[in-house]
Amino acid sequence: MDELGIPVYKRGFPEHLLRGYEFIIDVGTKIESVGGRHDVTKIPEMNAYDIKQESIRTALWYNPIRNDGFVLPRVLDITLRGYDERRAVVESTRHKSFHTNDQWVQWMMKDSMDAQPLKVGLDTQVWNVAHSLHNSVVEIDSKKADTMAYHVEPIEDASKGCLHTRTMMWNHLVRIETFHAAQEVHILFKPTYDIVVHAERRDRSQPFRPGDQTLINFGRGQKVAMNHNSYDKMVEGLTHLVIRGKTPEVIRDDIASLDEICNRWIQSRHDPGEIKAYELCKYLSTIGRKSLDREKEPEDEANLSIRFQEAIDNKFRQHDPERLKIFEHRNQRRDEDRFYILLMIAGSDTFNTRVWWSNPYPCLRRKLIASETKLGDVYSMMRSWYDWSVRPTYAPYEKTREQEKYIYGRVNLFDFVAEPGIKIIHWEYKLNHSTREITYAQGNPCDYYPEDDDVIVTKFDDVAYGQMINEMINGGWNQEQFKMHKILKSEGNVLTIDFEKDAKLTTNEGVTMPEYFNKWIIAPMFNAKLRIKHEEIAQRQSDDPMVKRTLSPIAADPIVLQRLTLARFYDIRPALIGQGLSRQQAQSTYDEEISKQAGYAEILKRRGIVQIPKKPCPTVTAQYTLELYSLSLINILQQHVARDCDEEAIYEHPKADYELEIFGESIVDISQVIVLVFDLIFERRRRVRDVYESRYIITRIRRMRGKERLNVIAEFFPTYGSLLNGLNSAYVVQDIMYLNFLPLYFLAGDNMIYSHRQWSIPLLLYTHEVMVIPLEVGSYNDRCGLIAYLEYMVFFPSKAIRLSKLNEAHAKIAREMLKYYANTTVYDGGDNSNVVTTKQLLYETYLASLCGGFLDGIVWYLPITHPKKCIVAIEVSDERVPASIRAGRIRLRFPLSSRHLKGSAIIQIDLVGRFTVYSEGIVSFLVCKKNLLKYKCEIILLKFSGHVFGNDEMLTKLLNV
């Protein structure tokens, strides 16, 4: 057949009369527009795709379950490319057969980040599949529906410099935590406590005596508040305090629900059947997130929650030995308290240590918060009233801590509701040296000895470091046991100090502050300068994460944030605000603030953006961020190879080279940056590879093990591969410096989970000597990707050290490092495909609300079988942009196999049901009126210039070649 008829009908036309047609359009069913924009808030009610109406940052982690399956808009592009690259194989029967690279095809489909969770209508009488648009409903025969996919776009706003074809790039940057705002860690009195002055003394030389209730400045029952004189006296150690539990208003209803469960348990005479662990965890979950919401939780949260539920079931059994001990009759013991005590024991055993407010798992954090509302300082009460002590197997120091009380808790500054002027405690964190004036000859080694004497300095523990090196030489790299905090001295150890645990309320001395309070700590190996101090709130709480809450806020520059390795001292959030589904809404101030950075215009000119918008679109910010990130990473890593230059010339380091010449594809993905690093620095190639090739190179390297992995590296990067092969005969330090490039292959990715939250990988650090340090990936001390890695690479050795002869230990260390990287699977903790790969529709819908509005369409591909195999695209859409532009956008969906797309037909429908048709390529059209009995409709006749269409199972065949 060379002609396809598509009926277009309005309300009142009997649909069953069109049963013989494979593709029909109902222009009588529509969603009313509001204010000239499509009402995207109706999407959850439509037969379209699965996006919930919720906060945009919450929506990023929604697992789509209300759908009829996923489709890939580019599945034809991928499979056609696989078809094009078939290889002929002569079989034993001398018959020639063709085989596609099915491994590549399967990887491409799995790696696609634009999967659409469709929620369609199914007509079981005629077996049609219905897809809703805002101006129409499209139905297609189920035999042909496998190539249908939505084609939605946000309309560009010229004043904002929009380039919405880069929406995927924006999506990518959020996933790799490079489009985020930060707030420093904030600490305050736990809102679950009332801290009451019980007694006072005039100076610290007077001890507090049991039973003494002497009051000097305050009346009985005075509660301590941070903006009150009582707090100053407390910090001076002049007050003896009593802690009582209280319920914050924000979680009062949730605590009441827990109380109902507790009361049912008590009234049933402690029947374990009344303890439904899943129901308990549901309420606790709400409490945990309201009190300290990090929005993104650990990937293994679900598994740990199940273990917690099992521990609850076990601990409430009537014959559990510890339960029997808790139920021994003593004065002051109450059943309500016992309920929360048993919850605490179950949670502590689940995590195998004491639980603190800073615990990363909300299911444990929340049970602590709930228990504190009833018991005050929980662990202290468990020890003094119930004779329960933390296990000897728990983390070090927890045994000694149960004698004290801890009144401070970490709170997320993004959510903390407080008026300007309120006193808080917070961590300042900045780079010790953002840049330095150096020469190639002197290098930029890590300086152990800061110029300021009035600081605490984080130092390496030579004994512990020596023990680690001996273990590595004798037994290889132990990724589970080698930790950075273990090789640092205890004083000023920024990986172990924790104000929540170090500031405590003692029985005799009142509150004692840690010695590092209000003092600068310099950690040279992290290039970090930190101080915890009292500060004031500067701005009210806002949904916009870019609003800086304090008078001394953390940096906003996205590249500086990538250099702040010690992420335990700040919180981050995607720089997005508002709802996932909205017709029109305000944009975060993030983009406007980033546009004020030095060099902003120069960076954008590299991307072809000459006119700089005052209020840029997020796609502009995304281009700026990734371009600057690429230049910064290249500049830092170039210092680690031997260079022919003026060794005494002074230059600023690190500093991105805005004049760096590179060619080829635009950089839209971190994998392109990583591949470019090796191409540019080692292979002297300035061409940027496309995103698919770059991602596949990284995948192939990860897929191999041992010698095969090194061979694949050498296949793509011959010069770098030969340098790795020469490690066995390494003679000077420069010969082993190339090892520090290997982590690039394994740390970054937008759909990966590290194998463990606290495994470490080896990295060379250059001080006055060459050291190897454990770089912890995915741990509580850093974020993800290259954040854990980048700042260490700012350090590089002097020329004298580069050319110094390797000692025997260094040579052995280098071989063990290469062995580790040849076999590591640190990146292979699984993925989160259902969540991560289905968010492109969400980003496009959200971006539409920030810019010019939303347009939608749906595309179907018709296979042509004669005289030459090809495809044509048929799209039904609204009329908000010219059809020629829509056709161009369809061509962009075929970056790998565009030669097969020989034409397109665009059917555009306006708000009142009128339609126009546009065609190009081998497609032409004719619109006719059709009378059927007493009913009328219109038929769009698509003609294909002598080409014959057919092959209903085109996609099925392509996926099985």
Curated annotation (Swiss-Prot):
MF-aspect GO terms: structural molecule activity
Subcellular location: Virion
Keyword Nucleotidyltransferase among record annotations: no
InterPro entries xref list: Capsid_VP2_Orbivir (IPR001742)
Claim: Flavoprotein is one of the keywords in the record: no
Domain of life: Viruses
CC annotations in GO: viral inner capsid
Keywords from the named record: Capsid protein, Clathrin-mediated endocytosis of virus by host, Host-virus interaction, Inner capsid protein, Viral attachment to host cell, Viral penetration into host cytoplasm, Virion, Virus endocytosis by host, Virus entry into host cell
Principal location class: virion
GO biological process: clathrin-dependent endocytosis of virus by host cell; virion attachment to host cell
Function: The VP2 protein is one of the two proteins (with VP5) target of the host immunogenic response. Responsible for viral which constitute the virus particle outer capsid. It is the major attachment to target host cell, probably by binding to sialic acid. This attachment induces virion internalization predominantly through clathrin-dependent endocytosis.
Family: Belongs to the orbivirus VP2 family.
Protein name listed in UniProt: Outer capsid protein VP2
Source organism of the structure: Bluetongue virus 1 (isolate South Africa) (BTV 1)
Lineage summary: Viruses, Riboviria, Orthornavirae, Duplornaviricota, Resentoviricetes
